[in-house]
Amino acid sequence: MTLKYVVNNTFYTNINQVLKQEFHISARLLHKLILSKHVCLNSVPVDTRNGVSINDIITVNLDFEEESENIVSTKMDLNIIYEDDGLLILNKPAGITVHPSILHYTDSLSNGVKYYFESIGLKRKIRPVNRLDLNTSGLIIFAKNEYVQEALIQQMNNHVFTKEYIAVVSGTFDKKAGIINLPIARKENSIIERCVSENGQTAITEYEVLNETNFFSVVKCKLLTGRTHQIRVHMSYIGHPLIGDSLYGSSSDLINRQALHCNFVSFEEPVSHKVLSFSCELPEDMDILIKIRCQNTFS
């Protein structure tokens, strides 16, 4: 993956200025690119202090042969939604973690992505951009290089990156759409559980009721921040815990995990700056749940 810029003004006096202003490359990555001779001026590797002139061509090779040495390569079936030189977007099933852990050392999604990269001849670090809980399904994005990862995380921080979820929750809403703005913190004496707390970090969830019966609602949730368990905590706090969420509500005979699915993402592609949008269907367990309880099929 390559960045290219043709100098068209006299404002810039050196390559460093161009790379920071035009591409917003971090100092850390810039240092790494220079050491690896991945920055070229008119096809010649240079230092960023080199001066520039009108019509000079600056190119930056963003790809490195590097691996996540602590991640084991494991063959698995990946549901690939989209792939290009900088991105891999998957539809993650429930019941699989994104990152390896002591309990999931070889069967996380990252293990499968590493195997996939190796199978197509790529040596890359595994760089998940967004997070999904073990029992949350849906769209998950992996960056193929540090530049794309940094750019997308920055978009999340600037609220340019859109993430939408479908949740099935208990009860019905008096207000069919709204914004939940309640800070979230780690619950005292718990490693996993979160709670609404005035001492927590800002957490904002936008919601819209799509379908409902007397006892259940299908809700679209848009994250304006990205706190751990944010939708689950917010919905539980306002009296509408997710169906099947044993941590913030109660388990259910209708579904064996929390009924939460990331069905839509939209962001600006870091190199072309085109807006990319992706969606995926509900998994079978949630589709059946909605048919049974809401007497309607969401699609």
Describe the role of every protein-language-model region.
Residues D47-G51, K220, R257:
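Short, surface-exposed secondary-structure edge patches
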Residues M1-I179, A185, D285-L289:
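RNA pseudouridine synthases
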Residues M1-K32, M76-L78, I204, V209-N214, ...:
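Pseudouridine synthases involved in rRNA/tRNA modification
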Residues I96-H99, I192-E193, S217:
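Short small-residue beta-strand/loop micro-motif enriched in glycine and branched aliphatics
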Residues N130-R131, V196-N199, L254-R257:
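Short Gly/Pro-enriched turn/cap motifs at secondary-structure boundaries
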Residues V113, C195-V196:
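Secretory N-termini
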Residues N61-D63, E188-I191, T202, D245-S251:
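Short Pro/Gly-enriched beta-strand edge/turn motifs at strand-loop
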